Amino acid sequence: MIPNNGKLIITPAEGYTPHIGVLVSTLQRCRETTIALVKDLSIHQLDYLFDEQDNAIGALLMHLASLDVAFQEITFRGRNCMDVPELVAKWEVPMNLDAPARQQIRGNPIKYYLAEMEAVRADTLAQLKQHDDVWLWHEQSDGDTLINNYYYWYHVYEDEINHRGEINWRLSRIPAA
């Protein structure tokens, strides 16, 4: 994580081009806030489902990691992660957050989820160091939509903030074990 040294100021992270550095600072601040919220959760809290359509906090955390993987493939490698069998095997279930996620993403301690999130984020950060701001603004077609690399990575923290709100809501309502 990027230390804030008692400051809550978004500035370009060192070692990156200016705009990528701001993106990295934003991604990392978002992640730090998520980790602070979940770092002490029990397996009961991570696995709790309110109903048969619900997604547990553990599944949401794996979903956050899966977004890094998906956008690494699109923006760094120019391919869909669902076209890579080894990535499908590991990340399709958390990416989709459906019945298989409710059944399969269970029973893990928080350290498991945090390690998964950290591993994929470390790869994201290493890859972002290899690119410049021109790459960040590169536009491509995603079906009928024009999208740039910045938007993909913006969506990573946008989605994380949304799911963190969902996690907060859940934590205020999960009954004690």
PLM region spans:
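Acidic/histidine-rich alpha-helical segments that form the ligand environment
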Residues: 93-136, 152-156
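Short, contiguous alpha-helical
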Residues: 2-10, 24-28, 32-35, 45-96, ...
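Hydrophobic alpha-helical core bundles mediating ligand binding, dimerization, or RNAP-core interactions
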Residues: 27, 31-34, 38, 117, ...
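Short, charged, low-complexity loops and linkers
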Residues: 10-24, 102-105, 112
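Conserved catalytic core of Hanks-type protein kinase domains
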Residues: 40, 63-64, 127-130
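Short, mixed-charge, low-aromatic patches
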Residues: 16-21, 73-83, 119-125
